[in-house]
Amino acid sequence: MGRFTLPRDLYHGTGSLETLKTLTGKKAIVVVGGGSMKRFGFLDKAVAYLKEAGMEVELFEGVEPDPSVETVMKGAEAMRKFQPDWIVAMGGGSPIDAAKAMWVFYEYPDTTFEEIITPFSFPTLRTKAKFCAIPSTSGTATEVTAFSVITDYHKGIKYPLADFNITPDVAIVDPELAETMPKKLVAHTGMDAMTHAIEAYVSTLH
């Protein structure tokens, strides 16, 4: 038997970032990457919308490309201190992937990274927070999938984490964000999309 899981709500269209105003909660942490979302003004907009929704907002910035286990643990620690009920991941695949893993260790601080390497072995999430993904690139599709890729640089291994629990609750796909991509990145993410299609065909995880 197969299973196909998508976010509960997917908002698409120019200006859909404003949907953040409709989220209900007390605190939101926004996870972002290298600075493009701040540079183009989208981070400030997101924070303003969340505050308009009545939430206290904190940022976790600087998630690197191919996020590391260390970054994930730092983010989870920041979440445990702040205690958000919304995790908002914004940017390319890396900050969204990292935030998914942070989510696990925020809700289950005693869990080890080794325990979640096995596909579909995660503990039940949403005991503390829900997840909203806002992609700024095309190609990774992490905003609508049950997957995350985290790198252990000490071992030199990229770990694909897989569990339906980490499928976002809400995905906001606003094309205004993707329009900021340079041509080279557009090409790279196109290859990413093609690679995902090939992976689905040759995967032994059935």
Residue positions per predicted region:
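General beta-strand structural signal in soluble alpha/beta enzymes
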Residues: Y11-H12, E58-E61, V88, A98, ...
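Acidic, glycine-rich active-site loops and adjacent beta-strand->loop/helix elements
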Residues: V63-P67, S94, M102-F105, S136-G139, ...
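A glycine/threonine-rich phosphate-anchoring loop and its flanking beta-alpha core
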Residues: E107-H206
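ATP/NTP phosphate-donor binding region
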Residues: M1-W86
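Glycine/serine-rich anion-binding loops at beta->alpha junctions
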Residues: P84-K100, S136-E143
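Structural signal for hydrophobic packing residues in well-ordered secondary-structure cores
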Residues: T24, L50, M79, W103-Y106, ...
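Short Gly/Thr/Asp-enriched flexible loops that form oxyanion-binding sites at enzyme active sites
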Residues: K74-A76, P95-Y108, V144-T145
